[in-house]
């Protein structure tokens, strides 16, 4: 009634697809259970579409890909889709000071110009404080809607605060 159109983004039959049918979503789930679906981040889009330069020979035949937040946001932003909703974003992993394991979701959030992301915060297995620091460094605003608590995916309050609070969507 508000003009919102759900459009699942994925790699399907070797193409970036925006707006999958229920049957296509079911196919992704079933084939994913058989390891026939690639996890596709921003960096993986070109190789999976080229279908030739992936390091693992068995992956060269893959024509299905579940897009991460970074890949989904890249596609949504290119198409000027104004809102992208997801469960949680990636972030800085615990012990990142030695592993340097930081999700490309954070960089992509700083690049998006046409799309905002609505989510339940950072995945709770991550270092939320460090993730918020990286988002601040990258110039990404975090917004709490009717709350001053930053969520931790499964919980409402991570112990951290968003950078901005809003009480109305208008």
Please place each PLM-identified region on the residue numbering.
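Flexible, glycine/proline-enriched loop segments at strand-loop-helix junctions
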Residues: 45-64, 94, 113-125, 159-163
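A glycine- and small-aliphatic-rich helix-loop capping segment at beta-alpha/alpha-beta transitions
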Residues: 23-36, 91-112, 134
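Acidic, glycine-rich active-site loops and adjacent beta-strand->loop/helix elements
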Residues: 12-16, 88-92, 96, 121-124, ...
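Short coil/turn connectors at secondary-structure junctions
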Residues: 2-6, 42-45, 54-55, 59, ...
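Internal active-site segments that recognize and position negatively charged phosphoryl groups
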Residues: 65-92, 121-138
């Amino acid at each position: 009634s508000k003009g919102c159109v759900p459009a699942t983004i994925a790699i399907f039959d070797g193409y970036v697809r925006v707006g999958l049918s229920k049957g296509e979503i079911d196919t992704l789930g079933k084939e994913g259970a058989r390891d026939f679906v690639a996890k596709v981040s921003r960096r993986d889009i070109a190789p999976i579409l080229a279908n030739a330069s992936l390091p693992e020979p068995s992956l060269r035949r893959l024509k299905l890909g579940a897009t991460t937040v970074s890949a989904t946001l890249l596609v949504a932003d290119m198409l000027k889709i104004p809102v992208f909703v997801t469960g949680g974003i990636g972030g800085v992993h615990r012990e990142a000071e030695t592993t340097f394991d930081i999700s490309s979701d954070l960089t992509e959030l700083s690049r998006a110009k046409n799309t905002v992301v609505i989510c339940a915060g950072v995945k709770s297995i991550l270092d939320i404080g460090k993730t918020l620091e990286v988002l601040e460094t990258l110039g990404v605003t975090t917004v709490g809607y009717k709350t001053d608590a930053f969520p931790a995916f499964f919980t409402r309050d991570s112990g951290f605060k968003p950078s901005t609070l809003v009480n109305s969507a208008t």
